[in-house]
């Protein structure tokens, strides 16, 4: 492993892989591979990266009719440097998708059952508020896995949570929103804002609750990690792909964990995403009822 790249040298790398990324496209592929009607809504350019994203979505059966293309826009581009233990450094060019006011096809929200807003860039909380308002007007359910720009203003984010149906964060992110030291404390305290809460802590597992049942799960499998890119997207979208179809909290967490585990065994965020019908095995998991003292 290295901690810095020396200047003035040409360094050899073992392998190069090209793939599409971005939180929204990653989660859309999970939904599509689980047999759901998935649609990708965002603003892209006509640059090679944008066209590659569209082709990748089409190949996965993801509807791209809600994508707005503008010649002024340019998709982001990242170089991911992966160490032998699966940890990575990402060199990220954010691209441009309209800044704080991107051109989006908000009408695409109206016919959805669920939306999963993520990685809203410069639009931040105002754009998230607009998306949530559109969803509420048409009784569309919302799962939120907030990113850095949204978490940078936790008080404003909390004001939006009453409209969210499922909230998924890691432990450090949830501690920006509610008090608590353990995963259980954080998840239970977040029930004051959201009806379904998921809090993860990497190899230490995950806690999820719907206010009636609390599930604590460990790792699905203890396997060598090739690349952690997309693991969080795979977990959150894996959960929703099952929960939205009426599966139990326990079943949804098992699939989410399996999906995330599969993704980290491959290079890139999409190759390891599970397909419909895959056989899953049991995992370390504990389930108990939530009582009044908990909340």
Regions found by a protein language model. Give the residues of each.
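Glycine-rich phosphate/adenosyl-contacting loop at the front of the ribokinase-like
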Residues: 1-43, 48-55, 59, 290-295
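Anion (oxyanion) recognition and catalysis
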Residues: 32, 58, 136, 161, ...
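A glycine-rich helix N-cap at a beta->alpha junction
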Residues: 56-73
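Conserved phosphate-binding/catalytic loop of the ribokinase/pfkB sugar-kinase fold
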Residues: 65, 69-70, 80-122
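Conserved beta-alpha-beta core of the PfkB/ribokinase-like small-molecule kinase fold
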Residues: 114-188, 204-206
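Conserved phosphate-binding/catalytic region of the ribokinase-like
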Residues: 151, 183-295
């Amino acid at each position: 492993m290295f901690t810095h790249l020396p200047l003035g040298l040409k360094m050899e790398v073992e392998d190069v892989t090209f793939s599409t990324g971005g939180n929204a496209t990653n989660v859309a592929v999970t939904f599509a591979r689980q047999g759901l009607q998935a649609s990708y809504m965002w603003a892209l350019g006509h640059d090679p990266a944008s066209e590659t994203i569209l082709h990748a979505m089409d190949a996965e059966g993801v509807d791209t009719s809600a994508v707005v293309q503008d010649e002024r826009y340019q998709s982001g581009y990242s170089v991911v440097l992966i160490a032998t233990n699966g940890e990575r450094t990402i060199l990220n060019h954010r691209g441009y998708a309209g800044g704080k006011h991107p051109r989006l096809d908000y009408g695409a929200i109206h016919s959805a059952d669920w939306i999963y807003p993520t990685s809203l860039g410069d639009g931040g909380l105002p754009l998230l508020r607009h998306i949530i308002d559109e969803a509420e007007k048409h009784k569309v359910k919302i799962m939120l896995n907030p990113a850095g720009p949204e978490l940078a203003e936790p008080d404003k984010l909390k004001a939006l949570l009453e409209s969210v149906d499922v909230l998924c964060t890691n432990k450090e992110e949830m501690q920006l929103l509610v008090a608590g030291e353990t995963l259980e404390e954080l998840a239970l305290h977040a029930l004051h804002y959201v009806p379904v809460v998921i809090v993860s802590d990497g190899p230490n597992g995950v806690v999820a609750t719907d206010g009636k049942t609390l599930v604590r799960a460990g790792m699905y499998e203890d396997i060598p990690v090739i690349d952690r890119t997309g693991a969080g997207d795979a977990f959150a979208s894996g959960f929703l792909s099952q929960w939205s179809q009426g599966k139990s909290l326990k079943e949804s967490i098992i699939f989410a964990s399996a999906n995330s585990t599969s993704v980290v065994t491959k290079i890139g965020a999409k190759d390891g995403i599970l397909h419909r019908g895959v056989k899953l095995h049991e995992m370390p998991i504990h389930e108990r009822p939530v009582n009044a003292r908990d909340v």
